[in-house]
Curated annotation (Swiss-Prot):
Subcellular location(s) of the protein: Cytoplasm, Cytoskeleton, Microtubule organizing center
Stated family: Belongs to the tubulin family.
Protein's job: Tubulin is the major constituent of microtubules. The gamma chain is found at microtubule organizing centers (MTOC) such as the spindle poles, suggesting that it is involved in the minus-end nucleation of microtubule assembly.
SUPFAM superfamilies in UniProt: Tubulin C-terminal domain-like, Tubulin nucleotide-binding domain-like
Key words of the record: Cytoplasm, Cytoskeleton, GTP-binding, Microtubule, Nucleotide-binding
Species name: Chlamydomonas reinhardtii
Annotated GO CC locations: cytoplasm; gamma-tubulin complex; microtubule
Chief subcellular location: cytoplasm
GO molecular function, one term: GTP binding
GO biological process: cytoplasmic microtubule organization; microtubule nucleation
Name of this chain's protein: Tubulin gamma chain
Pfam families noted in UniProt: Tubulin, Tubulin_C
Gene: TUBG
């Protein structure tokens, strides 16, 4: 029986990426942009019910909730070719319409102010499910709505639906470009705290790496937002393919998460995808892939240039960094014996450096390709990996935060906009509650980075047992 997943898309980035995700799911299941089943979509074998439900007129409606504090992006969706796809009752735009002003505190408190409205939407959607498994949330960690309101949604759902899984697709800002959002490090730190404490799995999507992949692998001179969002949506769709086109293993979200996350706090996952082709980047000319054997795909997935997280590590750190776990989702008509041979070759050549305290093996899930989408390649692959080098991304957030705040909170640059939010202003006007919030978030994120560093040690398990 399908285990349903409710999808939340929060803020500008979340809704832009989310609309691309639903566009891909409709294509893969033979669903027209108005939710009607295409005449040619008669083959079956897929589980549409995981992400869609049917209305009385048999229209397929996404299990999606669209949230934003300013109207531009959602208004764009409502006037696009997807305008008849979503349930209008599941769309929330703030009545003020002024957005969060790139301010985490504003996004958080505006979400808190409409708690009952948000819960009504979530509860109603949950009632449409026969066996709700969990939630996916798509958002950015750097702006105001995706970070602040997204953080509030994580707290709200983990409290209300404590036994259901929460997985996020979290977009990290481009580290190689100067941002016009000067408080980006504040927003990122406060959001990372909630992702650490309230999410069960976080798929890290790093704009730095995505831009680099688009330029170097897809030969796009200046990739635009839509092209990057299409890449992200490709990863999202591929990561759910075993749920929608089930095989023998990894047919539910619980199984996927359990196979990748042996220790609860270390639940931040990297991704790699191959082959990167024209359909991944909205029809642009791309690099030619000459062959797509299982071995070729699995080798490519381990190449750093295909990983969608950029950690800017020193050579010494790279040598110490290790895989905690790897799950390769291989799509296409594949002979299982070829998978076994490919794994043997990779193991013999020691192409993946694993932790010493866990099973040093690559897990593989085989999935069918959609019969309704024509591709130029026979086999494609997505890697979901738990890798200790992700800690360098957290350390970068901490360093950027300290540049603004100061090591002992002595600088407090650009803090006034946060202090102006009533929740974080105390009676004395000093914003003590806000400073405590930042100090706590810093400690949580530092502990997270330290935990990933500790995973690189052979005696990690013994240390954990002694600590407990």
């Amino acid at each position: 029986m399908p285990r349903e997943i409710i999808n939340l898309q929060v803020g500008q980035c979340g809704n832009q990426v989310g609309s691309e995700f639903w566009r891909k799911l409709c294509q893969e299941h033979g669903i027209a942009k108005d939710g009607r089943l295409e005449d040619f979509a008669t083959l079956g074998g897929d589980r549409k019910d995981v992400f869609f439900y049917q209305a009385d007129d048999e229209q397929y409606i996404p299990r999606a909730i669209l949230l934003d504090l300013e109207p531009r992006v959602i208004n764009g969706i409502q006037t696009s070719d997807l305008r008849n796809l979503f349930n209008p009752e599941n769309i929330f735009i703030s009545k003020e319409g002024g957005g969060a002003g790139n301010n985490w505190a504003s996004g958080y408190t505006q979400g808190e102010a409409v708690q009952e409205t948000l819960l009504d939407m979530i509860d109603r959607e949950a009632e449409y499910c026969d066996s709700l498994e969990g939630f996916n949330m798509c958002h950015s960690i750097a702006g105001g709505t995706g970070s602040g309101m997204g953080s509030y949604m994580l707290e709200l759902i983990s409290d209300r639906y404590s036994k259901k899984l929460i997985q996020t697709y979290s977009v990290f800002p481009n580290q190689s470009e100067s941002s016009d959002v000067v408080v980006q490090p504040y927003n990122s730190l406060l959001t990372l705290k909630r992702l650490t404490l309230h999410a069960d799995a976080v798929v890290v999507l790093d704009n730095t790496a995505l831009d680099k992949i688009a330029v170097e692998r897809l030969h796009l001179h200046k990739p635009d937002v839509q092209q990057i969002n299409s890449l992200i949506a490709t990863v999202m769709a591929a990561s759910t393919t075993t749920l929608r086109y089930p095989g023998y293993m990894n047919n539910d979200l619980v199984g996927l998460v359990a196979s990748l996350i042996p220790t609860p706090r270390c639940h931040f996952l990297m991704t790699g995808y191959t082959p990167l082709t024209a359909e991944n980047a909205a029809g642009q000319v791309t690099s030619n892939i000459r062959k797509t054997t299982v071995l070729d795909v699995m080798r490519r997935l381990l190449q750093p240039k295909n990983i969608m997280v950029s950690t800017h590590t020193k050579s010494r750190d790279i040598a110490n960094a290790k895989y905690i776990s790897i799950l390769n989702i291989i799509q296409g008509e594949v002979d299982p014996s070829q998978v076994h041979k490919s794994l043997q070759r990779i193991r013999e050549r020691k192409q993946a450096n694993f932790i010493e305290w866990g099973p040093a093996s690559i897990q593989v899930a085989l999935s069918k390709k959609s019969p309704y989408v024509q591709t130029a390649h026979r086999v494609s692959g997505l890697m979901l990996a738990n890798h200790t080098s992700v800690r360098h991304l957290f350390n970068k957030v901490l360093r950027d935060y300290e540049k603004l705040m100061g090591p002992k909170q002595e600088r407090q640059a650009f803090m006034q906009a946060y202090r102006d939010v009533p929740r974080f202003a105390d009676a004395a006007g000093g914003g003590t509650a806000l400073l405590e919030e930042f100090a706590d978030a810093k400690e949580v994120v530092q502990d997270l980075a330290n935990e990933y560093a500790a995973c690189e040690s052979a005696d990690y398990i013994q240390r954990q047992m002694m600590a407990s």
